[in-house]
C-alpha cells in the first residue's frame, strides 16, 4: 500500500470539536470523518482497524459455537409492543413511519427480532442449546452524542443471544460466552477487566461488563487487591472501615446556626464527619412514596442501588418539592421524629451505619442538630441495605485480606443472563422431554466493535499519536523513504516492502514527496508498530533505521538484514 495512492488525510492541528484523545487522534490520523452529530464515515485506515477487530470477534464467536446470522436493522413496532419496550425504551429509540403509516424502529438491540425468529424455527428441546450472533450497525438517538466513536449515535456492534431449556444449561452458555470474551480481549492485546454489573434497562438476573482500562474511562471499577473480585461502581460492594464504638451518650439538641453541609457541621462540632448522618429525601413518583435514605457522612449515595432498593423511577426530588411535601428544613433533615412529617416516609439506612454509635443528624429544625443519637433508644433500627458507593480502601466482601481499589475503564462488552423476560412476553417455547411446552431461558452478549477501536487508542497512545497493538494495527510496518527522488533509496524501499508483504505482513510505503520531518510525524501519528527509514546518511552507510513505535528505540540494521530482522521480531511478538 502506497501512502501517495491512499486516502490518509492527516491533520497537523487538534480538531477543536474533539474532547477525548481517541476522537482527536482518529480525526488527526485520518481514520474517520464526521457526517452528522454522532455519525461518522470510516476512511481506509480506520476501516482496516475496524475489520481486524471484527475478524477476531467473529473467530472467537464461531469457536464458541455461536451461529452467525444477519437480522434487519428496521424492526416492526408490533414486536416491541409484544415485549413491552415500545413505550418503555424512551427517546433513544429512533421511530420510523413508512408510507402505509406503519410504525418501525431502527434497532438499538435485537432481543425482539431474535425471539421472533426462534419461536418460529425452534420447536423442540433437541434443537437446543442455540446461540445466534450478528455483527451489524446499530442506532441509538443519544441526546448528546460526544467523544467521537466512543459515544456516537450509529455504531458497529456484535450482539449474540442464547436460548436454553433451563438455568443449568444457561449457565453453560453464559460461561462459554464469558470465556470467549476473555479470549477476544486477550487477542486484541488490550488491558481489560471483567466486572460484575447492574443489569440496567435490558433487565435480567446476572451480568458482567468488560472494561478496557484507561484513565479517561467514564466508568469507575472497584477491584480487590488480593482476589479476583471486581465490579462496576453501580454494583460494587465494600466493607466500610469500622468506626470505634463507645458508650452511648445522651442525645443533645445543639445549635448549629448556618451549618447545613456535612463538612460544615463536622467542622463546627469538631468531630469526624464519618459519625454524621447524611439524610436524603428520595421519592417514587409512580407510587408517591417518600423515603429517607441514611448514609455515613463520609459516604456518597449510589443512585442505582437506591433505585434497586426502592423503585426503578425513584430519584432525589428538588429541595423545594421535599420541603412542600414533608414540611422539612433543608440542611437540617434527620430521622429522629420523622413520624411527624406531613407525609409518611419509609426509612432505609446504609449497611455501614448498622453499628455506628453516637451519631449526629439534623434535628428537623432550622439551625439545630442532634448529637449522641443511637439506634433503638432514640430511633428504631430501620431496614439496612447497601446504598453507597464503594470507597478506596474498603474491605473486600469476598476475601479477608484484600482491600478495594478504584480505577477507570471504558465499557466495551456486556454479558447478561436475561432469564425469561422476553421468552415469556413473546411466547418463545419448545416441547421438553415430556412433551410439555416450556419457555426458553435467554442470555444476551454484546461487544461494541467500533468502540473497541476508540478504547484501544485511549489505552495506547503518547503525545505523538497512536501506538497500535499489533493485532489490530492497520499495518505492521511503515517504510518511509526520506527522498523518493533518490532512485537507489526508492528502489530499496520498494524491495523491502515487497519482501515484507511476501512474509504476510501488511506494509505502508510512504513514497510522498514531502519533508522528512513531516513524514516522521505522520508515522508516529498513524502508530504502526515499526517504522523503517530508507535514505539519508544511514542508507549511504549501508543501514536502515528501524524504530519501535511503543518503546521509541531506534536501531540501525544492515540493509540486507532489515526484512529478516523484522520478520523475526514480529513473529516473536505474535507468539507472545
UniProtKB/Swiss-Prot annotation:
Molecular function GO labels: aminoacyl-tRNA deacylase activity; ATP binding; proline-tRNA ligase activity
Sequence similarity: Belongs to the class-II aminoacyl-tRNA synthetase family. ProS type 1 subfamily.
Annotated organism of origin: Magnetococcus marinus (strain ATCC BAA-1437 / JCM 17883 / MC-1)
InterPro entries, per the entry: aa-tRNA-synt_IIb, aa-tRNA-synth_II, aa-tRNA-synth_II/BPL/LPL, Anticodon-bd, Anticodon-bd_dom_sf, Pro-tRNA-ligase_IIa, Pro-tRNA-synth_IIa_bac-type, Pro-tRNA-Synthase_IIa_type1
Primary location recorded for the protein, binned into one broad class: cytoplasm
Origin superkingdom: Bacteria
Protein name: Proline--tRNA ligase
UniProt record, GO biological process: prolyl-tRNA aminoacylation
NCBIfam families assigned: PRK09194.1 (NF006625), proS_fam_II (TIGR00409)
Cellular compartments per GO CC: cytosol
Catalytic activity: tRNA(Pro) + L-proline + ATP = L-prolyl-tRNA(Pro) + AMP + diphosphate
General function of this protein: Catalyzes the attachment of proline to tRNA(Pro) in a two-step reaction: proline is first activated by ATP to form Pro-AMP and then transferred to the acceptor end of tRNA(Pro). As ProRS can inadvertently accommodate and process non-cognate amino acids such as alanine and cysteine, to avoid such errors it has two additional distinct editing activities against alanine. One activity is designated as 'pretransfer' editing and involves the tRNA(Pro)-independent hydrolysis of activated Ala-AMP.
Assembly description: Homodimer.
Entry's free-text remark on domains: Consists of three domains: the N-terminal catalytic domain, the editing domain and the C-terminal anticodon-binding domain.
Keywords: Aminoacyl-tRNA synthetase, ATP-binding, Cytoplasm, Ligase, Nucleotide-binding, Protein biosynthesis
Subcellular compartments: Cytoplasm
EC number: 6.1.1.15
Amino acid at each position: 500500500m502506497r501512502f501517495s495512492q491512499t486516502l490518509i488525510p492527516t491533520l497537523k492541528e487538534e480538531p477543536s470539536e474533539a474532547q477525548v484523545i481517541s476522537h482527536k487522534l482518529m480525526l488527526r490520523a485520518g481514520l474517520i470523518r464526521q457526517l452528522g452529530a454522532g455519525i461518522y464515515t470510516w476512511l481506509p485506515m480506520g476501516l482496516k482497524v475496524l475489520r481486524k477487530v471484527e475478524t477476531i470477534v467473529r473467530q472467537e464467536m464461531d469457536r464458541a459455537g455461536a451461529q452467525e446470522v444477519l437480522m434487519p436493522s428496521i424492526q416492526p413496532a408490533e414486536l416491541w409492543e409484544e415485549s413491552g419496550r415500545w413505550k418503555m425504551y424512551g427517546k433513544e429509540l429512533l421511530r420510523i413511519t413508512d408510507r402505509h403509516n406503519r410504525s418501525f424502529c431502527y434497532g438499538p438491540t435485537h432481543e425482539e427480532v431474535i425471539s421472533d425468529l426462534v419461536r418460529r424455527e425452534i420447536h423442540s428441546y433437541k434443537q437446543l442449546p442455540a446461540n445466534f450472533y450478528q455483527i451489524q450497525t446499530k442506532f441509538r438517538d443519544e441526546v448528546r452524542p460526544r467523544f467521537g466513536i466512543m459515544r456516537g449515535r450509529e455504531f458497529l456492534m456484535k450482539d449474540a443471544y442464547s436460548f436454553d431449556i433451563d438455568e443449568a444449561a444457561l449457565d453453560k452458555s453464559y460461561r462459554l460466552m464469558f470465556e470467549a470474551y476473555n479470549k477476544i480481549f486477550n487477542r486484541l492485546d488490550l488491558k481489560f477487566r471483567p466486572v460484575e454489573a447492574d443489569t440496567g434497562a435490558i433487565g435480567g438476573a446476572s451480568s458482567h461488563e468488560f472494561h478496557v482500562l484507561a484513565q479517561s474511562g467514564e466508568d469507575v471499577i472497584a477491584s480487590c487487591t488480593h482476589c479476583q473480585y471486581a465490579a462496576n461502581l453501580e454494583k460494587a460492594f465494600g466493607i466500610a472501615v469500622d468506626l470505634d464504638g463507645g458508650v452511648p451518650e445522651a442525645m443533645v439538641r445543639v445549635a448549629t446556626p448556618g451549618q447545613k453541609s456535612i463538612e460544615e457541621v463536622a467542622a463546627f462540632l469538631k468531630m469526624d464527619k464519618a459519625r454524621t448522618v447524611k439524610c436524603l429525601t428520595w421519592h417514587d413518583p409512580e407510587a408517591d412514596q417518600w423515603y429517607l435514605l441514611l448514609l455515613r457522612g463520609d459516604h456518597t449515595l449510589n443512585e442505582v442501588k437506591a433505585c434497586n432498593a426502592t423503585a426503578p423511577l425513584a430519584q432525589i426530588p428538588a429541595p423545594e418539592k421535599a420541603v412542600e411535601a414533608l414540611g422539612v428544613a433543608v440542611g437540617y433533615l434527620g430521622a429522629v421524629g420523622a413520624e411527624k412529617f406531613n407525609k409518611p416516609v419509609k426509612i432505609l439506612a446504609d449497611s455501614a451505619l448498622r453499628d455506628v454509635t453516637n451519631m449526629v443528624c439534623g434535628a428537623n429544625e432550622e439551625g439545630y442538630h442532634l448529637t449522641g443519637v443511637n439506634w433503638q433508644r432514640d430511633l428504631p433500627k430501620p431496614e439496612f441495605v447497601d446504598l453507597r458507593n464503594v470507597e478506596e480502601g474498603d474491605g473486600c466482601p469476598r476475601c479477608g485480606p484484600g482491600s478495594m481499589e478504584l480505577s477507570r475503564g471504558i465499557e466495551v462488552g456486556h454479558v447478561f443472563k436475561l432469564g425469561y423476560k422476553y421468552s415469556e412476553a413473546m411466547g418463545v417455547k419448545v416441547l421438553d422431554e415430556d412433551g410439555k411446552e416450556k419457555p426458553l431461558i435467554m442470555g444476551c452478549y454484546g461487544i461494541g466493535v467500533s468502540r473497541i477501536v476508540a478504547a484501544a487508542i485511549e489505552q495506547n497512545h503518547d503525545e505523538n499519536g497512536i501506538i497500535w497493538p499489533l493485532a489490530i494495527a492497520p499495518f505492521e510496518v511503515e517504510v518511509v523513504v526520506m527522498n523518493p527522488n533518490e532512485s537507489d533509496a526508492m528502489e530499496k524501499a520498494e524491495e523491502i516492502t515487497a519482501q515484507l508483504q511476501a512474509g504476510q505482513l501488511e506494509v505502508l510505503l510512504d513514497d510522498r514527496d514531502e519533508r522528512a520531518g513531516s513524514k516522521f510525524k505522520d508515522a508516529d501519528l498513524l502508530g504502526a508498530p515499526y517504522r523503517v527509514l530508507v535514505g539519508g546518511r544511514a542508507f549511504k552507510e549501508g543501514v536502515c533505521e528501524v524504530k519501535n513505535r511503543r518503546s521509541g528505540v531506534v536501531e540501525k540494521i544492515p540493509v540486507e538484514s532489515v526484512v529478516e530482522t523484522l520478520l523475526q521480531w514480529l513473529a516473536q511478538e505474535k507468539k507472545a
